[in-house]
UniProtKB/Swiss-Prot annotation:
Protein name: Quinate/shikimate dehydrogenase
Family named by the database record: Belongs to the shikimate dehydrogenase family.
Biological function: The actual biological function of YdiB remains unclear, nor is it known whether 3-dehydroshikimate or quinate represents the natural substrate. Catalyzes the reversible NAD-dependent reduction of both 3-dehydroshikimate (DHSA) and 3-dehydroquinate to yield shikimate (SA) and quinate, respectively. It can use both NAD or NADP for catalysis, however it has higher catalytic efficiency with NAD.
Primary gene name: ydiB
Signal sequence segment: none
Residues annotated as binding NAD(+): A132, G133, G134, A135, N155, R156, R157, D158, K205, C232, V233, Y234, N235, G255
Length: 288
């Protein structure tokens, strides 16, 4: 790829960032489509995020992806949020139209699309959702919009717990889905809801390098063959949770599915063109 002065810049702002596959995936897609953009990753944490957004405007970047820990903070620095992004309270995509910033969240649509592509119908189903960060709430919001009956959200009593309660209230007021929030320390409640759940989704970073030997499921007997277990983490590809799920006879969806589908939507938002899906799956080695 020969980058010229006509190329526009798209970024990814997160910390840490060097593990991300998004730059490789998006640049392969852009090159295949013959589009004059290049995608670069920038290590940006909460403290440096405001300055990074000013830089985005000053450099007239086309936009940026947003990942941990900036997804919720980023909502404060855009001019407009989509209805779904408002429901989530977090964004992973910013599009810059001549200095006017629009915030989107493709994490939720990407993850739910990966579930649907596997042949699983979420309508009327119950999801146990682990975590209340940007990715987790995006998945919950999109699932609620697309027909989940119940979401049982579990989170530790940390700085995200109050945000989880606020998220549940927004979803309960704006959709037909019923969301409840429980402390993850309540393992009895966790076991009880898993027994009758249809989907278990890990929306936390537990299982991601360097936490690859950890899982929020402490007892593999809680998993049952009728349960679909889905993962947001893709580094490593096979997390401990997915290993547990496969041992228990569960159907699983790895983090590549969400990465692929959320990235495809981002690509179209930034470029206005279709994402070369099959090509990217092939060159990136994604089975999703």
């Amino acid at each position: 790829m020969d980058v010229t002065a006509k190329y526009e810049l798209i970024g990814l702002m997160a910390y840490p960032i060097r593990h991300s596959l998004s730059p490789e995936m998006q640049n392969k897609a852009l090159e295949k489509a013959g589009l004059p953009f290049t995608y670069m990753a920038f290590e940006v944490d909460n403290d440096s995020f405001p300055g990074a957004i000013e830089g985005l405007k000053a450099l007239k970047m086309r936009g940026t992806g947003v990942s941990m820990p900036n997804k919720q903070l980023a909502c404060e620095y855009v001019d407009e949020l989509t209805p779904a992004a408002k429901l989530v309270g977090a964004i992973n995509t910013i599009v810059n139209d001549d200095g006017y910033l629009r915030g989107y969240n493709t994490d939720g649509t990407g993850h739910i699309r990966a579930i649907k592509e596997s042949g699983f119908d979420i309508k009327g189903k119950t999801m146990v959702l682990l975590g209340a960060g940007g990715a987790s709430t995006a998945i919950g919001a999109q699932g609620a919009i697309e027909g989940l009956k119940e979401i049982k959200l579990f989170n530790r009593r940390d700085e995200f717990f109050d945000k989880a309660l606020a998220f549940a209230q927004r979803v309960n007021e704006n959709t037909d889905c019923v969301v409840t929030v429980t402390d993850l320390a309540d393992q009895q409640a966790f076991a009880e809801v898993l027994a009758s759940a249809d989907i278990l989704t890990n929306g936390t970073k537990v299982g991601m390098n360097p936490l690859e030997n950890e899982s929020l499921v402490n007892d593999i007997s809680l998993l049952h063959p009728g349960l679909l277990v889905t993962e947001c983490v893709y580094n490593p590809h096979m997390t401990k949770l997915l290993q547990q799920a496969q041992q228990a006879g569960c159907k699983t969806i790895d983090g590549y599915g969400m990465l692929l589908w959320q990235g495809a939507e981002q690509f179209t938002l930034w470029t206005g063109k279709d994402f070369p899906l099959e090509y990217v799956k092939q060159v990136m080695g994604f089975g999703a």
